[in-house]
């Protein structure tokens, strides 16, 4: 089973940069998007063979998530049941017979860390949500977590120590997710590899120089460990400031 997650930084813009060709080439069983930045009715994607599920932010041109899946889920839930968080369209959960699939667009702490306090509330509530799901079925969660966990997960750790996405607080929260048992699937296969990133600033020719961050993840419940088959970061695929990340799993 092949799963893809991609922060498209605006699906309408990404469509103009070859999204549909990349989608077809990747041929995923489940394809998750973050930061779709659209409202209902603004985008009509013809994707034969896929069921589509979209969650929208209340504001125009902000946040949003989507999931395209070849197999119809048993149920779909939008959000995590907390209005403060759910108004931004950040989470979609698909229930299948043997697992839950959750896609997430974690809030960015923003410049001057003005949203860090809110981010900490989000982290606590979202982890509680995942753990609650896990009580009944294993969980696969993917998306833009807006954090580089370790120094090997970004090009310039020293100069970014107090910047959004690499603060001690954000890293500690992601650490708690892993301490609760979830597996960072890319690091499961590549524990020490450096220079593999999923996001690059549009400034300073960052992508050309590979001055990036690994902030897009697939994490899974520990009981799926023996079913993990592979993980990839598709840095060759353009169309966004992020690239798609992949999980191969037998389910």
Where would I find each of the regions flagged by the language model?
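N-terminal, active-site-proximal structural segment of metallo-dependent hydrolase catalytic domains
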Residues: 1-47, 51, 57-63, 149
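Active-site-proximal beta-strand elements of phosphoester/diester hydrolases
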Residues: 1-9, 98-110, 142
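Metal-dependent phosphoesterases centered on the DNase I-like endonuclease/exonuclease/phosphatase
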Residues: 24, 30, 51, 125-211, ...
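Structured beta-strand-rich core segments of catalytic domains in phosphoester-bond hydrolases
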Residues: 37, 42-109
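Conserved beta strand-loop-helix elements of the APE1-like EEP
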Residues: 60-75, 204-226
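Active-site beta-strand termini and strand-to-loop segments that position acidic
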Residues: 70, 94-97, 221-222, 247-251
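Surface-exposed cleft-lining segments at the edges of enzyme active sites
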Residues: 81-82, 107-123, 158-163
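Surface polyanion/phosphate-binding segment centered on an Asp-His-Pro turn
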Residues: 234-251
